[in-house]
Amino acid sequence: LKARHGFFVAAALALQIGSAAAANPPGYPQRREVKEFIAEMVKRHGFTRRELNRVFGKAQFQPAIIKAMEQPAETALASWQAYRAIFINPQRVEAGVQFWNRNAQSLARAASEFGVPEEIIVGIIGVETTYGRNIGTYRVIDALATLAFDYPKRAQFFRGELENYLMLSREAKIDPLRVKGSYAGAIGIPQFMPGSYRRFAVDYDGDGLSDLATSPADAIGSIGNFLKAHGWIRGEPVGFAAEVSGEGWRKLAEAGATPANRAAELPGFGVKLAVPVPPDTRCALIELETPGQPSDFRVTLQNFFVLTRYNRSNLYAAAVMDLATELARAKPGLPAPQPNPGRENS
């Protein structure tokens, strides 16, 4: 792990904290659970109480973050086709091809080094931040403090991310009050959570920094590194369109994205693949629902499951699949992409 991270260096120069952001929130430094967290950080990682009291004294509770966590986009829309339309449209495909052309060398290198197709990496960046245009407007300390101490459903997870964020800030020698990201505390072009930033961010442009805010090359290499570390299989597809009949398929769909069944077993569940797949291929069945319309069904493989490690939503992973397919189709000079895993005209 490098002692400095370019994202935080850039943030230090670019962001200013206004007087409103410096106002004390009601009670963070005085709350028992915050005091216990500070004591643990002092004991385990050598922070001083003074510096952490300063940080938590200026961290602000953000009720809008709780609202966003309670109603994420896929839940609010309750429709695969509506969710898909946000990310797969001519404007985002055109912007993605431009991003691809600008970063062709880094993408080719990542595909060779990590085995992840270029269009998958571009697709992730397109879904996450519209190719780096929208990296978030919340202070990361506000997001993580709100979720660590005021969102009991996932407090344990976000306290771990808060711990990683404070360590990352110290390693970068930057004030943790100055960094901005998503409502969940994700950072930079690829929207890495702090724990993933510390584990998987790489310096891919050779400047000595792992800079996920301003370096597309570092973002590209870091995504490839993340996916490979989570089990991406070089040369294997993500998934295929499928048709279902009867009721046996429901058992597969309810089991989730873990590829637990052999392709040869699928006909016994009433599942028919759109393309031939080797019989021993491990796979899962995903149903993508749109009210008032027939569902889309996909037989998904290990690489789809890996995409759900990046964001644990089948809708998200399917959107990355489809955007990647459209990007590969639109990119001049590429071989024909694999068959569209969704509907023929979707």
PLM regions: where:
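C-terminal soluble interaction/assembly domains
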Residues: A242-S346
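Secretory-pathway/luminal and periplasmic proteins that interact with or process carbohydrate-rich
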Residues: F61-A68, T129-R139, D150-A155, E171-L177, ...
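Bacterial N-terminal signal peptides
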Residues: F8-Q16
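Acidic, glycine-anchored loop motifs typical of Ca2+
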Residues: Y204-L212
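An acidic, Gly/Ser/Thr/Pro-rich helix-cap/linker signature
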Residues: A23-A111
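Substrate-binding/active-site groove segments that recognize
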Residues: V140-F149, I187-V202, I223
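Short, functionally critical alpha-helical segments immediately adjacent to catalytic or ligand/cofactor-binding
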Residues: M41, L52-F61, V116-G132, Y165-R170, ...
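Bacterial N-terminal signal peptides that target proteins for export
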Residues: L1-F8
